[in-house]
A protein has these predicted regions:
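A charged, aromatic-enriched C-terminal amphipathic alpha-helix characteristic of glycosyltransferases
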Residues: 399, 413-449
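Acidic anion/phosphate-binding donor-loop and adjacent secondary structure
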Residues: 71-74, 78-81, 206-213, 253-274
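A short, active-site helix/loop in glycosyltransferases that binds the activated sugar's phosphate group
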Residues: 187-188, 208-209, 225-250
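Conserved catalytic-core segment of nucleotide-activated headgroup transferases in glycan assembly
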Residues: 107-110, 127, 237-340
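Aromatic "clamp/platform" in nucleotide-sugar-dependent glycosyltransferases that forms part
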Residues: 357-358
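Membrane-proximal helix-turn-helix segments that form the acceptor-binding/catalytic region
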Residues: 166-172, 212-230
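Short hydrophobic beta-strand element within catalytic cores of glycosyltransferases
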Residues: 375-379
Length: 449
């Protein structure tokens, strides 16, 4: 009996609860009048076969082609909305995966800032719809407080889980939606008119996938000619247009992110303390080139570019393994799931950072750290060739070991040259005011659709 139950649970994991129940019902209905003992003898079930064979024969396992196609990428399943008459004030809904701790950095924080500023400027209500977990309002409160944003109306939160969990959320006829990924855009497009959607795109998301179904679905959304696009940085905007997305040029605009001095700034340092080298370490985000970064750091240590008598290495990110450098003689410090305040404090105490990103977007850590007074070494990619227009404390190298080692050597030299490093910091061209960053975006929301 226990083996039968285990097989049932395995079938459920593979095909889902709905398909399991449907399979049982269909087989039972067809065979309910069969005489006892008429089921054919069958050999012992192979491990990969479903337990349903035991009860209903060997022709089990057929699934709906439509359901299989829909289940392949469940995150793009349509939002389950019901329409209600438009109310006052009007509402703007931000659709994202999560706003909880561990998700607030970079792109998610930017989406909340943008949505809040648009709601503030248009006197609209803000609603945040999350898909992977219920929202913790504290996440939004931290962002709004950090950047001094005040909303007139109470923020609403709704949970629209991916999968079979039943839910329905209301939707105004004139509601505007800000989506934050190709999958949240696909889910929203399936439920509302395309003219009500603005897609905040902060990376070439096609690069998340090998060529296949997911890549193709993503490319379909990025090529949509009926929705508006807001692109994070001109670099990414130019790349997307040049890569065959003229609709982004026609229906899109770009903004440059901001790094207010109240948050990102150099901190006071203890005299005589070793300098700090930060490595942005995310082994499960493959575009951050975690393993190449380890190789690069080990080579820099072996060649004397990074002297561990003078430098401490700090690994910051997520799911970081326990690592020792220099043939096991040096144990690096690991920091994970930092709060926004802790992250800003860390950035302000960093001298040199290695931040790799195998995509056209510069990513946030190089900007966060340069805005906090650090020197940053990062890589070139496509049209991302030179980031000195943001800060001369950002050094780019080609993704070859020798080129990146040369960039590391330049980074160490600059980080230890207090005068030049300070001059570069004082002449940073990074934005410092989110309202200025999103001024044109807000104007677009204030205008007619």
């Amino acid at each position: 009996m226990l083996d039968l139950l285990n097989r049932a649970l395995r079938y459920q994991r593979i095909h889902g609860t709905r398909q399991l129940l449907q399979e049982i019902f269909n087989r039972a209905r067809r065979r309910r009048f069969a005489p006892v003992g008429t089921l054919p003898d069958t050999p012992p079930l192979a491990e990969e076969k479903s337990w349903v064979s035991l009860a209903f024969g060997d022709d089990h396992g057929w699934v709906s082609a439509r359901e299989m196609a829909q289940r392949y990428i469940p995150s793009r399943a349509p939002l389950r909305l019901f329409m209600v008459p438009s109310g006052q004030p009007r509402r703007i809904s931000l659709v994202t995966d999560s706003i909880n701790k561990g998700s607030l950095y970079g792109g998610v924080g930017t989406s909340m800032i943008m949505a809040a500023l648009v709601a503030q400027a248009t006197q609209s209500r803000l609603r945040i719809i999350t898909r992977t977990e219920p929202a913790q309002p504290a996440g939004l409160q931290i962002v709004l407080k950090t950047y001094g944003i005040t909303l007139t109306h109470e923020v609403e939160f709704a949970y629209a889980p991916v999968g079979d969990t039943p839910y329905e959320i209301d939707c105004f006829e004139d509601e505007q939606f800000i989506t934050t990924s190709w999958w949240t855009t696909a889910a929203t497009l399936a439920s509302v008119r395309s003219q009500s959607i603005t897609y905040l795109l902060q990376e070439d998301e096609r690069m998340f996938y090998p060529y296949g179904d997911e890549h193709m679905r993503c490319a379909q959304i990025l090529g949509n000619t009926d929705i508006r696009f807001i692109i994070n940085t001109k670099l990414l905007f130019d790349h997307l247009v040049a890569s065959g997305l003229p609709n982004v040029a026609t229906h899109g605009m770009w903004f440059e992110p901001s790094f207010p001095h109240e948050v990102f700034r150099p901190r006071d340092r203890d005299v005589g303390k070793k300098r700090q080298l930060l490595f942005y370490a995310r082994p499960h985000n493959v575009r951050n080139l975690f393993y190449f970064g380890l190789e690069l750091l080990e080579a820099a240590i072996a060649r004397g570019i990074v002297n561990l008598d003078e430098w401490d290495i700090v690994l910051v990110g997520k799911d970081i393994p326990k690592l020792r450098f220099d043939n096991g003689r040096y144990t690096a410090k690991r920091l994970e799931n930092l709060s926004w305040t802790e992250y800003a404090e860390l950035a302000g105490n960093t001298d040199l950072a290695l931040c790799l990103m195998y995509t056209p977007h510069p990513s946030y850590p190089p900007f966060d750290l340069a805005a906090s007074g650090a020197v940053v070494v990062t890589n070139r990619f496509a049209n991302k060739q030179d980031l000195s227009g943001y800060s001369k404390n950002i050094i780019c190298g080609d993704l070859q070991l020798e080129s990146m080692l040369a960039a590391m050597a330049s980074g160490v030299a600059l980080a230890t040259d207090a005068t030049q490093r300070s001059d570069n910091f004082q002449n940073n061209l990074l934005g410092t005011d989110w309202k200025a960053s999103f001024a044109e975006v807000v104007q677009r929301f204030e205008g007619p659709r």
